[in-house]
């Protein structure tokens, strides 16, 4: 009974630490597999934000970018909360209107 109590007591703490260490290791492995420097990742982030911002207004406080590895595949995860969709402006429709 005492051994069960000690096992439960210590397994909670080690499980929590174990999960944190596992998450850190996954993040490190994802960065290594993608072979991206922090500067390259930041450059990609800024470029993605620039392109997406042309079409929608983003909530900058809720944005998240991170690398994730699952099943040997590394993915860049971008969570971009959208406030509103911007009106679509196309050069084609303007030039057609001017010709008519």
Swiss-Prot record:
Record-stated family? Belongs to the MinE family.
Judging by the UniProt lineage, the source's domain of life is Bacteria
> What Pfam families does the record tag this protein with?
MinE
The protein's gene is named minE
Q: What biological process terms from GO does the record include?
A: cell division; regulation of division septum assembly
- Name of the featured protein: Cell division topological specificity factor
**What is the scientific name of the source organism?**
Synechococcus sp. (strain JA-2-3B'a(2-13)) (Cyanobacteria bacterium Yellowstone B-Prime)
Q: Which UniProt keywords apply?
A: Cell cycle, Cell division
Q: What does this protein do?
A: Prevents the cell division inhibition by proteins MinC and MinD at internal division sites while permitting inhibition at polar sites. This ensures cell division at the proper site by restricting the formation of a division septum at the midpoint of the long axis of the cell.
